[in-house]
From Swiss-Prot:
Domain of life: Viruses
Annotated stretches, region: Disordered: 23-52, 92-118
Protein name: Protein Rev
Gene that specifies this protein: rev
GO biological process: mRNA transport; viral process
HAMAP family xrefs: REV_HIV1
UniProt xrefs under InterPro entries: REV_protein
Task performed by this protein: Escorts unspliced or incompletely spliced viral pre-mRNAs (late transcripts) out of the nucleus of infected cells. These pre-mRNAs carry a recognition sequence called Rev responsive element (RRE) located in the env gene, that is not present in fully spliced viral mRNAs (early transcripts). This function is essential since most viral proteins are translated from unspliced or partially spliced pre-mRNAs which cannot exit the nucleus by the pathway used by fully processed cellular mRNAs. Rev itself is translated from a fully spliced mRNA that readily exits the nucleus.
Placement of sequence motif Nuclear export signal and binding to XPO1: 75-86
Subunit structure of this chain's protein: Homomultimer; when bound to the RRE. Multimeric assembly is essential for activity and may involve XPO1. Binds to human KPNB1, XPO1, TNPO1, RANBP5 and IPO7. Interacts with the viral Integrase. Interacts with human KHDRBS1. Interacts with human NAP1; this interaction decreases Rev multimerization and stimulates its activity. Interacts with human DEAD-box helicases DDX3 and DDX24; these interactions may serve for viral RNA export to the cytoplasm and packaging, respectively.
Keyword Cell membrane (UniProt): no
Length: 118
């Protein structure tokens, strides 16, 4: 499903169903605008805290069922000085210059593999 390798579709669907149920079972609409300023502030604060709890539980469900974090792994990119554009094939006259798919050459492909799962 969606190009995920190694993850079972059933696990993904189960996680999505659980998270959907979690959000639907929270009969907690946004707070009403009535009342004093302090009362409104307290209602908003409590509502935001409940929403944060639901979000953190959803992240834990994802990490449990899919075996990975819900947050993306930071990608280590090489310095800009080491990147070059190879335009040997597609550079033509001024009318077609820049058309095509330039290749980006990187010295060490192992830099991009540092975020893989162990």
């Amino acid at each position: 499903m969606a190009g995920r390798s190694g993850d079972s579709d059933e696990d993904l669907l189960k996680a999505v169903r659980l998270i959907k149920f979690l959000y639907q079972s929270s009969s907690d609409p946004p707070p009403n605008p009535g009342g004093t300023r302090q009362a409104r502030r307290n209602r908003r604060r409590r509502w935001r805290e409940r929403q944060r709890q639901i979000h953190s539980i959803s992240e834990r469900i994802l990490s449990t069922y899919l075996g990975r974090s819900a947050k993306p792994v930071p990608l280590q990119l090489p310095p800009l000085e080491r990147l070059t554009l190879d335009c040997n094939e597609d550079c033509g006259t001024s009318g077609t210059q820049g058309v095509g798919s330039p290749q980006i050459l990187v010295e060490s492909p192992t830099v991009l593999e540092s975020g893989t799962k162990e």
